[in-house]
Amino acid sequence: MLKLLQQYEYKIIYKRMLYTCFILFIYILGTNISIVSYNDMQVKHESFFKIAISNMGGDVNTLNIFTLGLVPWLTSMIILMLISYRNMDKYMKQTSLEKHYKERILTLILSVIQSYFVIHEYVSKERVHQDNIYLTILILVTGTMLLVWLADKNSRYGIAGPMPIVMVSIIKSMMHQKMEYIDASHIVIALLIILVIITLFILLFIELVEVRIPYIDLMNVSATNMKSYLSWKVNPAGSITLMMSISAFVFLKSGIHFILSMFNKSISDDMPMLTFDSPVGISVYLVIQMLLGYFLSRFLINTKQKSKDFLKSGNYFSGVKPGKDTERYLNYQARRVCWFGSALVTVIIGIPLYFTLFVPHLSTEIYFSVQLIVLVYISINIAETIRTYLYFDKYKPFLNQYW
């Protein structure tokens, strides 16, 4: 029997896919457990804000245990990333347990603030005064921590970490959008479809194209025709910046509302200046998106560590001295790549958002197109992860000889 099981051994990709499906089942089940009935929710016309929340696994159409999604977790990752960016050596020396505790404690604090904001903005005033608000906050925080735990487990034993949860949330949001009669000419509709297709091709270009910086490899003496190069993606941060930027924007809005409400109880919940119906709100979001895209890309590239690796191995760039000169050269190249990639993604997301200010009657269709773009971008990253595991399965018979 043991021999039969070894003969038909499941590949690692199948095991991980099965685990991810189990995580998604729990997530879908949790989103259907409502804390407050739909009739007690406030009707908000800011549709893109709801769509933005769904891009992080949340849902504010109904108040369920997973309403906050991964917003507090992603926001805590942003804060810790920006703090550690100034001293990468100290960050690399931290144990995984230290990083885990810092991340979870900060997530817990942010989820309390986010819960307070969501309850006051999306639940009717009568229901807020009737119910125990602290108990509702406790339920939301508990659900958020559970979802973070599921995403963390999926990172270890599943596929692509939080990406599948976000993808299911986006699909659910797209299915619940009500498409009304489009009051536009066929030329305008055709133009929108063409722009979406062009955007998808640009995103595919960003993911597939990489920048190659050739260097001299001292160990490469046998194959003189084979050049060694350092490769970076055009957008090293990938699709995670789209979720992080929305998370940071949501936290900024909820944080400002939380602070102002402490001094003025009659403060407006809508805060029209920080919505996607306002050019100021869109501009603030795009600035956050661009800055986070740049800093996260620089964080992942880690030119300081790369220059140390070159110094240890003896490899060097033509015309560049080892050590500090190599680090300055890599920083120069990294700035060019990271700013270009971050700016390109920001422009792709920003054009349709500003377009909704000029043609508000097409805002639902444009938001749907933005969600479709984000969905394809995330799908590309998930497909890249699956391809990596397939490579592992391909070489598994060879690797098993040494394990």
Swiss-Prot record:
One of its GO terms (biological process) is intracellular protein transmembrane transport. Gene3D superfamilies: SecY subunit domain. It is a multi-pass membrane protein. GO terms for cellular component: plasma membrane. The chain crosses the membrane at residues 17-37, 63-83, 105-125, 131-151, 157-177, 186-206, 240-260, 276-296, 339-359, 366-386. It comes from the Bacteria. It is found in: Cell membrane. The keyword Protein transport applies. InterPro entries: SecY/SEC61-alpha, SecY2, SecY_dom_sf. It holds the Pfam family SecY. Its main location: membrane. Keywords: Cell membrane, Membrane, Protein transport, Translocation, Transmembrane, Transmembrane helix, Transport. The keyword Chloroplast does not apply. Component of the accessory SecA2/SecY2 protein translocase complex required to export cell wall proteins. May form heterotrimers with SecE and SecG subunits. Part of the accessory SecA2/SecY2 system specifically required for export of possible cell wall proteins. The central subunit of a protein translocation channel. Belongs to the SecY/SEC61-alpha family. SecY2 subfamily. NCBIfam families: acc_sec_Y2 (TIGR02920), PRK12417.1 (NF009082). This is Accessory Sec system protein translocase subunit SecY2. It comes from Staphylococcus aureus (strain N315).
